[in-house]
Amino acid sequence: MGTGKKEKSRRIREGDTKDGNLRVKGENFYRDSKRVKFLNMYTSGKEIRNKKGNLIRAASFQDSTIPDARVQPDRRWFGNTRVISQDALQHFRSALGETQKDTYQVLLRRNKLPMSLLEEKDADESPKARILDTESYADAFGPKAQRKRPRLAASNLEDLVKATNEDITKYEEKQVLDATLGLMGNQEDKENGWTSAAKEAIFSKGQSKRIWNELYKVIDSSDVVIHVLDARDPLGTRCKSVEEYMKKETPHKHLIYVLNKCDLVPTWVAAAWVKHLSKERPTLAFHASITNSFGKGSLIQLLRQFSQLHTDRKQISVGFIGYPNTGKSSIINTLRKKKVCQVAPIPGETKVWQYITLMKRIFLIDCPGIVPPSSKDSEEDILFRGVVRVEHVTHPEQYIPGVLKRCQVKHLERTYEISGWKDATEFIEILARKQGRLLKGGEPDESGVSKQILNDFNRGKIPWFVLPPEKEGEEKPKKKEVEKTA
């Protein structure tokens, strides 16, 4: 078969419609017919249009024909995709409510459920006014209207004045509370010309806007949040406001408790606190140490369970939050078996959040310590929780009576090898003379000795702990057992 006129005549004579082995112009060893047609598309030129913009000749890669488009006439386009009866919805809603109250059960694939329909809301908290439930539209408007005046919050001027005074009182109480917490700085009274400072500035540590921004970053980036508590005072180092925030804003995130520094309390105290806190959240006892730790295997196993729950994710992030100096960075170092976070026996060592890789699918996030503001906490409580540095406290000797109240006499005698004091002042004087810490004229250095006692109290050299709350049905430990194990 050829490519000339004879081949064309033969195809017409025999009625052959196939191209045969006809070659495209430009086809050779380097370019096949498909490549040649593709290159000819660029050299064929653009489309040609007239002065009105109508297409006269289309380009080789254009098609002027418009396909007929239509929607398939199917009733499924206009029906419900999923239908559920009211009884089944109510049954599922009640089962879901019981599951959400149990912190040991996890709701998977939350995004595939209509949570706004399943979660029941209080009528009081609902944004709807529900006016028609109390009074019909016909009673207020129209020819049969019975109400002649609009209903106001106050029926007369006296009620309005009373409500206004209550609002002013609430506002003033809030102002006093903010001033007490040190959140508004020094409050100036221009009329009297004096400045009120209810609390030392050092006791507002851990409440700055920068610290709270770091906390929100950690919460937003974490799938699992670990709340680190001090085993000596778990309720005192618990951030309830943060828990309420997570319960309201991020209910899909997991929150667990880790009772750190359990080596500083007796075993029965740690066990009682774990039993008490486990009723609310999963709780683990932990002792942070790279060489000799406790609870490390249980914590890693729990994190692996959370990782297996979220198999649809490539990895999960675990954030550590809590009061300053509770051991968040030490727990991360214990899990990694080496020093990856900077640690110190003083609060405020961690400045910003930090990402650490634990394994292929689990990442850890370290967070600076935060102190939720509370009007119930005194300066003494804040100091004894290790929130502030003792060397920055003015007149530290005023907090020594609180140390003597929280510690047993035998523990102080065993620690400092002294005895025979009657009050805090005499205790400081005896200890100062024993250690030779005297000023000019043989006066004891009360400030220096008091700072030493407070540091020993916070760092665990003096044994102390808070007893767990007693519940009905629980046996109270015997006094002899408490004295023996303390």
Curated annotation (Swiss-Prot):
UniProt key word Nucleotide-binding: yes
Record-level Gene Ontology MF annotations: GTP binding; GTPase activity; large ribosomal subunit rRNA binding
Binding, GTP: G322, Y323, P324, N325, T326, G327, K328, S329, D366, C367, P368, G369, I370
Pfam family name, one: MMR_HSR1
Compartment(s) where it occurs, according to its Swiss-Prot or TrEMBL record: Nucleus, Nucleolus
UniProt-listed SUPFAM superfamilies: P-loop containing nucleoside triphosphate hydrolases (SSF52540)
Annotated positions of the Phosphoserine modification: S60, S85, S155
Keyword field: GTP-binding, Nucleotide-binding, Nucleus, Phosphoprotein, Ribosome biogenesis
Domain CP-type G: 212-373
Gene Ontology biological process terms, A to Z: regulation of ribosomal subunit export from nucleus; ribosomal large subunit export from nucleus
Gene3D superfamilies: 1.10.1580.10, P-loop containing nucleotide triphosphate hydrolases
Disulfide bonds: none
Transmembrane domains' residue ranges: none
GO annotation, cellular component aspect: nucleolus; nucleoplasm; nucleus; preribosome, large subunit precursor
The keyword Nucleus appears for this protein: yes
Region (Disordered): 1-20
Other noteworthy facts: Present with 67700 molecules/cell in log phase SD medium.
Role according to the record: GTPase that associates with pre-60S ribosomal subunits in the nucleolus and is required for their nuclear export and maturation.
PANTHER family: GTP-BINDING PROTEIN-RELATED, NUCLEOLAR GTP-BINDING PROTEIN 2
Family: Belongs to the TRAFAC class YlqF/YawG GTPase family. NOG2 subfamily.
Name of the protein this chain belongs to: Nucleolar GTP-binding protein 2
Protein's organism: Saccharomyces cerevisiae (strain ATCC 204508 / S288c)
